[in-house]
């Protein structure tokens, strides 16, 4: 009888442990804080999730892998911490915050709930604005060398141009895209020797 009781108690104990871990995981999954599956180096987890969403809207998944699958946001975060000067990193982060704030003010939906198509439309609208008003890009180039506080328009222009350029560069140089989308065949024809 004691053996039967021990097995019963063991079953109840393991069920309780299993159920509590599932409940904890479910509650943790309900948190409102956006998450990424990599550890950010130069950004907060919230900024990393925002960057990942922006990168995915620039290179969305279609028949080819998207920016998220290629690890573009992770690469950009690491590049910011290693390759950029501190003030450029500051411009990038502050520009991203201005971009997200303007998105929240001017769009019907908040940035965190927006689809990649909605974010893509906003980024495209920025480039249409830059095409119509080249002075904005000229102000960006001339403002980079100047010291002092930068305007929100400067920061946002810096961020949008840098994130699009860096996303495409990181996407096309990633291992996943290099092997699956653009595989290199050194000899495209069949070679028959003498």
Predicted feature descriptions by range:
Residues 30, 63, 192-194:
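Functionally engaged cysteine thiol sites
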Residues 44-48, 67, 154-159:
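Structural motif
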Residues 53, 71-194:
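Mature-region segments of soluble proteins
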Residues 38-42, 60-67, 83-87:
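A short N-terminal beta->alpha junction/helix N-cap motif
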Residues 1-5, 21-57:
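C-terminal segment of N-terminal export signals and the immediately downstream linker at the start
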Residues 1-17:
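N-terminal secretory signal peptides and thylakoid transit peptides that target proteins
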Residues 47-78:
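Post-signal-peptide N-terminal segment of Sec-exported extracytoplasmic proteins
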């Amino acid at each position: 009888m004691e053996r039967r009781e021990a097995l019963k108690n063991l079953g109840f104990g393991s069920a309780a442990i299993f159920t509590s871990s599932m409940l904890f995981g479910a509650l943790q999954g309900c948190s409102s804080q956006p998450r990424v599956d990599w550890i950010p180096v130069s950004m907060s987890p919230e900024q990393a999730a925002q960057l990942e969403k922006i990168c995915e809207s620039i290179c969305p998944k279609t028949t080819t892998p998207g920016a998220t699958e290629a690890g573009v946001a992770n690469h950009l975060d690491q590049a910011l911490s290693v390759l950029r000067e501190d003030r450029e990193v500051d411009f990038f982060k502050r520009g991203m915050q201005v971009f997200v704030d303007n998105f929240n003010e001017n769009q019907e939906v908040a940035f965190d709930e927006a689809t990649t198509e909605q974010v893509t439309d906003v980024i495209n609208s920025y480039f249409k604005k830059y095409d119509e008003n080249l002075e904005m890009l000229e102000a960006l180039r001339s403002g980079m060398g100047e010291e002092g506080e930068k305007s929100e328009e400067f920061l946002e222009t810096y961020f949008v141009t840098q994130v699009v350029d860096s996303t495409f560069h990181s996407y096309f140089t990633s291992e996943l895209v290099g092997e699956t989308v653009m595989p290199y065949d050194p000899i495209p024809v069949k070679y028959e020797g003498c």
